[in-house]
């Protein structure tokens, strides 16, 4: 279970 914040953080991390 991931929260929108965690998901957003993961997206940014992968994008970099």
Curated annotation (Swiss-Prot):
Enzyme class: hydrolase
Gene Ontology terms: biological process: proteolysis
Localisation: Secreted
GO CC term, one of those recorded: extracellular region
Keyword DNA repair: no
The protein's Enzyme Commission number: 3.4.24.-
GO MF annotation list: metal ion binding; metallopeptidase activity; toxin activity
Description of post-translational modifications: Glycosylated.
Description of activity control: Inhibited by EDTA and EGTA, but not by PMSF and leupeptin.
Keyword hit for Ribosomal protein: no
Primary localization class, coarse: secreted
Expressing tissues: Expressed by the venom gland.
Family note: Belongs to the venom metalloproteinase (M12B) family. P-III subfamily. P-IIIa sub-subfamily.
Subunit structure comment from the entry: Monomer.
Protein name from the UniProt record: Zinc metalloproteinase atrahagin
């Amino acid at each position: 279970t991931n929260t929108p914040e965690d998901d957003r953080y993961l997206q940014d991390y992968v994008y970099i």
